[in-house]
Amino acid sequence: MATVKISLSLASLSPSSSSSSIQSKLSPSFIPNAAPAKAVKLRFNGKSLRAKPMVYRSSRSVGVTCSASSSLTTLPSALLFDCDGVLVDTEKDGHRISFNDTFKERDLNVTWDVDLYGELLKIGGGKERMTAYFNKVGWPEKAPKDEAERKEFIAGLHKQKTELFMVLIEKKLLPLRPGVAKLVDQALTNGVKVAVCSTSNEKAVSAIVSCLLGPERAEKIKIFAGDVVPKKKPDPAIYNLAAETLGVDPSKCVVVEDSAIGLAAAKAAGMTCIVTKSGYTADEDFENADAVFDCIGDPPEERFDLAFCGSLLRKQFVS
């Protein structure tokens, strides 16, 4: 069965657009595992709009019409983003470089090349990643022998690496991925709770959210990151914590992830999950995802928006 990708674009609408003429094109190339969905009520520039997503398993172009309406429907209760690879494609030229600079400054004679780091990303968490690597290839001569002291050694490396990484973020050398700010704005405007759930250090995640999304958005976004839970992805602990803290039903949450381990965590938490592939995860297995795209996208190259997220929940409830 052929599949196509759809995108519901509200960003190009203007306040002067008439309710009968508001229309946007869909950009076909991949379709998620979704069924035709009911209209979704959104607010745009003071107007109540009704987006009617039409999902087809075909390679032909399709369209969607948005019209002013008072019809009520259900949007996600919460929109949960992973950080690295979703908000920003940080891994290859961000975290990897910062790890290597840390190793160099500590004179450890360790370098993670692009391919090796891609393999290490299958392990959730930077401290866990370093520990697994050293356990496999051998610990540096400068590392302590005692297990407890090794944990402190790894924690020190990770703290130094985080500080180097934050410099990259604060200098805005790593941009937001296309469509992230748009989707966050749509959620916040329509009363959908927004959170970032990441295995990365909390300071690094907060820096990304504050510096790249801006302080006004950041103060409305809840962050769950680092060691806030004892187990990292693919364990669902961080998504379970997010749902509990936000006071939302996991089945009414939509997660945006970029990796197979992130997808596994979201699904284990009972949540709907959209995957936006990143540089390191393009070839991973996303068979269990509710939708898969190359990115969120900004108009006119938009892939999906908040209305589409709602359509996936509707499909879940009627299936």
UniProtKB/Swiss-Prot annotation:
Its main location: plastid. GO terms for molecular function: hydrolase activity; metal ion binding. SUPFAM superfamilies: HAD-like. InterPro entries: CbbY-like (IPR044999), HAD-like_sf (IPR036412), HAD-SF_hydro_IA (IPR006439), HAD_sf (IPR023214), PGP-like_dom2 (IPR023198). GO terms for cellular component: chloroplast; chloroplast envelope; chloroplast stroma; cytosol. It is found in: Plastid, Chloroplast. Changing R129A: 97% decreased catalytic activity with xylulose-1,5-bisphosphate, but no effect on activity with ribulose-1,5-bisphosphate. Changing D84N: Loss of catalytic activity. Coiled coil: none annotated. Its EC number is 3.1.3.-. Pfam families: Hydrolase. Mg(2+) binds at D82, D84, D258. It catalyses: D-xylulose 1,5-bisphosphate + H2O = D-xylulose 5-phosphate + phosphate. Its cofactor is Mg(2+). Residues 1-65 form a transit peptide. Belongs to the HAD-like hydrolase superfamily. DOG/GPP family. This is CBBY-like protein. It comes from Arabidopsis thaliana. The gene is CBBY.
